[in-house]
Amino acid sequence: MGNDAPLAVLSDKPQNLFSYFKQLFAQVSNPPLDPIREKMVTQMSILVGKRENLLSETSKHSELLKIERPIMLNEEISKLLDIENKGIKARRVSTLFDVQKGKEGFEEALSEIKSKTEELIQKNVSVIVLSDRGVDKNKAALPSLLVAGALHHHLIRSNLRDKVDLIYETGEAREVHHFAVLYGYGISAINPFIALDTVRDFSKPEDYKKNQENFCKASISGVLKTMSKMGISTLQGYMGAQQFEALGIGEKLIESSFKWTPSRIGGIGIEEICDDYLLFHKNAFSDSKIPSNLKLDLGGLYLWRGTGERHMWSPETISLLQKSSTQNDSETYQRFEEAANKDYYGDITIRNLLEIDYESSKPIELEEVESEIEILKRFATGAISLGSISREAHETLAVAMNRIGARSNTGEGGEDESRYTPDPNGDSRNSAVKQVASGRFGVTTNYLVNSKDIQIKMAQGAKPGEGGEIPGHKISDYIASIRKTTPGVELISPPPHHDIY
């Protein structure tokens, strides 16, 4: 939620491959976990090495290496490559390709990685360290996710997947989502060396180790949170599980590298990905001597920048909306409409691509359709609890919906009983839809009988796969009285609604 930048497949800017994958989350099918309060049932350590036949029992089953955390430091990778003992044998495989060869070199390198890995497996190598170290003007890095997915599925098809574990030494992965997708497509551990080098560059010498540990800890916590949204408690169970949906990836690429991943709208292939990564490389090794060109491009993905990514909300649209609403100016609002429509900023979402075929449509007489009053009965606000928005906003929404014959929703925060009685001017602040959620805040008999609809929330909508939490300092006397709780005590909505069982 809240991402107003274009989908990766609709962006004018080059995109890393991670951007095309969206995380899945549990709703009613299986309950998500609370990664903070249920941490005792989770495990982020992993075992790497060759897996033996499950139906036999030999000492070789124990010839595995335990890695306590899946984000590895530079020195830990070096130590791993030095090990050659009790079935653990690690070798590095380069994931670079020749820039001059373009797409041909891109595909050649991908194919060579597969054959090189097979060759090493035949030599009893049990851990492959894929590495994109050594990038220079003539050598670029293959997309780490493409290498992971392609190799993972190649080994599955070759019946070799249980013979080896894959670890990635990559400068590309730097965010929690990047790590999660790599684990999801078969990578056991990651050494994000550029991210770690960046931490070092931003740290004082005496703080470097502590900051490095903080980065690793935060990254692992983020991956755990991502896993928890699907109700998966161990990283070993998440690895290779492919709990993602592709948005903008073509069928051919899905079949070769991301098999069994849903990709409902089709999209790009190897050629487009190669073009984007060659552009990344070209920008990194630009011949320009202009000082401004030597700075890293901010990109503007998360925050609007004049030369960055397009956004549905920009300084112009926000300014026009604020001015039109505060001054009740219809002319300014029309300018806001023009600035916010798709022709102004281009296609950002899938719905921007849809058009109504007015020419071949047959008009229906107004007498044959429902009246405005009947249609408005189906209009409803989102379920936004009192506390997440102010008392004034919550009550104003209810009054507005009641005036037009539509319905407002209390959200899961309860409702002031004084609102059940109409105001002297005839307005009603009573929300027609009363919500019962996992925390059951403010749910009383009086609350339920003053509703037109009772909405039982099976799972979180605004925070998919997560619960909600309000810190204690926000629980005022008024909020506590409505939620039937104690002032100053934090409130938690569990991720699942336990009545679903």
Predicted regions and their residues:
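Catalytic-face loop-and-helix region of soluble metabolic enzyme cores
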Residues: 160, 198-199, 205-209
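Flexible, glycine-rich loop/tail regions that form catalytic "lids" or insertion modules at the edges
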Residues: 1-107, 116-120, 124-127, 178-179, ...
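Conserved short loop/turn motifs at secondary-structure junctions
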Residues: 6, 131-140, 165-172, 383-387
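Glycine-rich, proline-tolerant flexible connector loops at the mouths of alpha/beta enzymes
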Residues: 130-146, 417-419, 465, 489-500
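Alpha-helix-loop-beta-strand connector modules within alpha/beta enzyme cores
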Residues: 140-168, 215-221, 225, 449
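Flexible glycine-/small-residue-enriched beta->alpha junction loops
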Residues: 461, 466-490
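Catalytic cores of alpha/beta
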Residues: 172-186
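Conserved, mostly hydrophobic/aromatic
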Residues: 132, 151, 182, 234, ...
